[in-house]
Amino acid sequence: LLVMASGNNGTDCDKKIYYPQGLDKTGKRIDNLIRIGASDINGNPGSISNYGKNSVDIFAPGMDITSLGENNGYTTSSGTSIAAPVVAGIAAIIRDYFPKLSAGQVKEILIKSVTPMNYKRVKIPGLNKKGNVATYDSLCVSGGIVNALNTVKMAQQLSSKKNK
């Protein structure tokens, strides 16, 4: 599974194309590429995160994340390049514990097992001086934020069905 940061322009990727788009030559979604947006500690999309109802698959924590820095120190960073490794790590756990699942199945599980945020009206990322709001299902395919526990549970269910 290829995990890709969607970008940090606060742009609707359904309207402005960023490559790779995650589509094959015929326009069909590629099942082994997942595009990630960044969310903050309150579950809101990051103000810089790209988004798109059809072009960003899932949001993950990616704003004000503290990690290791230079000289045995720490650093705080934000963006979809911070959120993408969160999803990659969860995908790696799934592939390790459930190696018979395909990349496409792992992507589907990640998308279907989110913490749904469709009910929450959030500020649309970008230079949003008008205060425009939307629900998560208009900002990404999954309509929510990655949930590691739900992902493991769903993978376990799917894997046990395949083994019967």
Label every PLM stretch briefly.
Residues 3-7, 36:
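Active-site neighborhood of phospho(di)ester-bond hydrolases with catalytic His/Asp-centered motifs
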Residues 18-96, 100, 144:
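Extracellular S/T/G-rich loop segment that most often corresponds to the catalytic His/Ser-adjacent loop
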